[in-house]
Structure formats: C-alpha cells, structure tokens
Curated annotation (Swiss-Prot):
Keywords: Ribonucleoprotein, Ribosomal protein. It comes from Delftia acidovorans (strain DSM 14801 / SPH-1). Gene3D superfamilies: Glucose-6-phosphate isomerase like protein, domain 1 (3.40.50.10490), Helix hairpin bin (1.10.287.610). PANTHER family: 30S RIBOSOMAL PROTEIN S2 PROKARYOTIC AND ORGANELLAR, SMALL RIBOSOMAL SUBUNIT PROTEIN US2M. Belongs to the universal ribosomal protein uS2 family. One of its GO terms (cellular component) is cytosolic small ribosomal subunit. PROSITE patterns: RIBOSOMAL_S2_1. GO terms for molecular function: structural constituent of ribosome. This is Small ribosomal subunit protein uS2. The lineage of its organism: Bacteria, Pseudomonadati, Pseudomonadota, Betaproteobacteria, Burkholderiales. It comes from the Bacteria. SUPFAM superfamilies: Ribosomal protein S2. One of its GO terms (biological process) is translation.
Amino acid sequence: MSVTMREMLEAGVHFGHQTRFWNPKMAPFIFGHRNKIHIINLEKSLPMFQDAQKFVKQLASNGGTILMVGTKRQAREMVAAEAQRAGVPFVDQRWLGGMLTNFKTVKTSIKRLKEMKAQQEAGLEAMSKKEQLMFVRELEKLEKDIGGIQDMNSLPDAIFVIDVGFHKIAVAEAKKLGIPLVGVVDSNHNPEGIDYVIPGNDDSAKAVQLYAQGIADAILEGRAAALTDVVKAASGESGDEFVEVEESAA
C-alpha cells in the first residue's frame, strides 16, 4: 500500500496546470512554478494520500463500499481495472445525473440490465433479427452506463474521484447525501468540501495509475486485515473450548 515520494515524482504527480488557470484555494499545496506551470508540493501530497489510504483501508475493513470514479479518457481503463481487482463498484464512462441522489431509479435500471443479461444467456432465438438488434443495443448502452455499479445494492460509504472538477456532478451529489469524498485535486480546482484531498496531477496516465492502484491496494489490505481478525477470533474461541474439554476430562 505504501507509496513513496520518488514514485510520485516519477509519475509526475507534482505537475499542476498553467499558472493562469490556478485556483487560489490550492495555494497551501503549491511549491512554486516553473515555465508557467504550477509545481505541487509532494511533501504535502504524500502524507495526504497516505491519510486517504488509511481512511479507505479502515472503511474496507469494516465492510464498507468505496465507489471509484474516473471517466476521463486517460483514467477509464485504469480505474475500471483497479476497481475490478479490488472488487468494488466503479464508473468509467460517464456520470449519469442522479446516479446517487436518484439511486432508486438507478436500481431499476440495474435490475433491467441483469434481466437482459440472463435473457441473452438463455438465447434470443425467439426474437426477430430487428428485435435482437434493438435488444443488443439497449443492453450495450446499459452495460456502458451502469455496468460498473451493477453489484452495488445500496449507496456507497465513500467515493474516490480522480479530477473533482471534471466530476463536479458526482461531487455535488456525494456532498448532498453526506457521502465522504476522497478526491485528486489539481492546481486548477477547489479542494473545499473534499474530505480527503490528494493534491496532484489529474491528467497524467502514470499519476492516475498511481492513485487508482494505491486506493485499490488499501481496499484489499483493509479486507485482508478484517479476515485475519475473524480467523484470530475464531481460533481463539476454539482454543477456549479445547481447554474446557481438557479440564472436564481431568
């Protein structure tokens, strides 16, 4: 789970946006500028990323669900891959307005998606060619829009977002519902309202990979820790029972 300063440096996490596009509220996290590009202070970014990982790890160990969001072209594939590795829901194509605030309707669409997938597996021979074409088109659209959250049965316990400005609707919905936000915030965006800010480059593919992998690792470590605790508790109970049997036998 541990990420080093060198790894952040090599991934280009420190490269912000052009100075003329900066958000003054990011000033505490900016080291300076070079060639009219803001340089983000990695001495701030590293511990803040580690804090975000600790939060996610604890949440996962308690059985919480983290929704990973990254719909920008350079983030889609990585976010989907890391979310699947960690076994958590994700949004990698586009954020549908109301995905959180109107989750009841979204659940209806999820039900429809699952029914259609089952129908496809059973066979579409009874349909005409035209009906099959329309069916497949609808299924592909649903899969693209909500495929990543089809196993999310309730609202997530936290949301991880790469580029809070690009995903402002997702951020607004989470804030409205009081869902904790873990967000990568570049020099041109506002960090206010983000519970766990990760100051850093939100455009570099290498940086995006580092964030997504780090959060996925934290989720997996949290689950593993919880499982270890369960095993320890179970073995402790069986040990007590064994001692009692020994005593009664004596």
